[in-house]
């Protein structure tokens, strides 16, 4: 699964709209839509906003590697 699809899967698993995700993560909606559409590659600063957010931390390992470690609280949204 490519990175953009993973972002979308995370957002949907949390039951969030794009606007709600952006509000939580601190992105503009226009920028986030470009991430989900694979038009922009997410840089370190933006990625850090996602993986350090308390609501999304549980997906960090999966987002970065595709792996999970449920025993460590690292899960997949799909």
Positions of PLM-derived features:
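A short, Lys/Arg-rich alpha-helix, primarily the initiator
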Residues: 1-14
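Residues within the helices of the helix-turn-helix
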Residues: 8, 19, 48
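The alpha-helix within a helix-turn-helix
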Residues: 11, 22, 51
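Short alpha-helical DNA-recognition segment
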Residues: 15-34
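Short, conserved catalytic or interaction motifs in soluble domains
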Residues: 37
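DNA major-groove recognition helix of helix-turn-helix/homeodomain DNA-binding modules
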Residues: 43-61
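Short, charged recognition helix plus adjacent turn
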Residues: 60-78
């Amino acid at each position: 699964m490519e990175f953009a699809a993973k972002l979308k899967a995370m957002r949907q698993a949390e039951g969030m709209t794009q606007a709600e995700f952006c509000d939580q993560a601190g992105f503009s909606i226009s920028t986030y839509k470009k991430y989900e559409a694979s038009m922009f590659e997410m840089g370190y600063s933006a990625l850090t906003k996602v993986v350090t957010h308390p609501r999304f931390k549980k997906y960090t390992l999966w987002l970065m590697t595709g792996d999970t470690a449920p025993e460590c609280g690292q899960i997949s949204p799909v």
